[in-house]
Amino acid sequence: LSGHVPRVVEPIEPFDKGSIDYDVLAYLIQLYGSAQGQRLHQDLRQKALDTASTLKPAQIRDASEAVLICYGDSLQRGGDRPLQVLGEFAQEYLDGVISGIHILPFFPSSSDDGFAVVDYRQVRSDLGDWTDIKDLSQHFDLMVDLVINHCSRENLWFTDYVTNQAPGKDYFHELAGVPDLTQVLRPRNSPLHTEIHTRRGVKKVWTTFSDDQVDLNFANPQVLLEFADILFFYARMGARYIRLDAI
């Protein structure tokens, strides 16, 4: 893609070919067109710069390091917050043994073991809160899941879609016509699309993983910006690594 930008547009800012900035701009222009791609690049670049100033310096990692993967409620103790218990256990028994902890989705969710996210910016109240996440990040490098293929039907974005309200009314993939889906293979037996009664009539939406998980439409640049905001929010809350789910 390094040769893509000059053929399409002269960038607003000059970037060295081969730089991350240049490559990101090239991708955005290819996906969203010249004008929209440049606007998105400026917005995303500023969000990244604003967040970078709050982060710890990067460290070099190698294959000798280990990361613990667990759910937020894997460890429990009486009425204590499970995330607090996890942090105390890890500090007492795993300090020097592991460098990081991957906590599987700890957000409010309606199904699929946390992968049908209802609210991306909240911690499940039965697990703890963002204070517990930040405390863990002071001692271990945290990995957080960003579920970007789909969200829960209980997410407020989908309520917007059903009621034809901004911003969510344009956030989801609708099925146009009757495409041939016979060649689609996936480890699920639920329908690829689901009929939804909306204020605009009955619509079919893509539901790749289940009828409770509606596919998000990244052809809408506002969806990209929304998830960039969420990603940088996770970084500010202490996430060191982001796992992109269902890519």
Predicted regions: what they are:
Residues I101, I242-L244:
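Hydrophobic residues within beta-strands of alpha/beta enzymes
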Residues P6-A228, F232, R236:
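Acidic/aromatic-lined carbohydrate-recognition and catalytic surfaces
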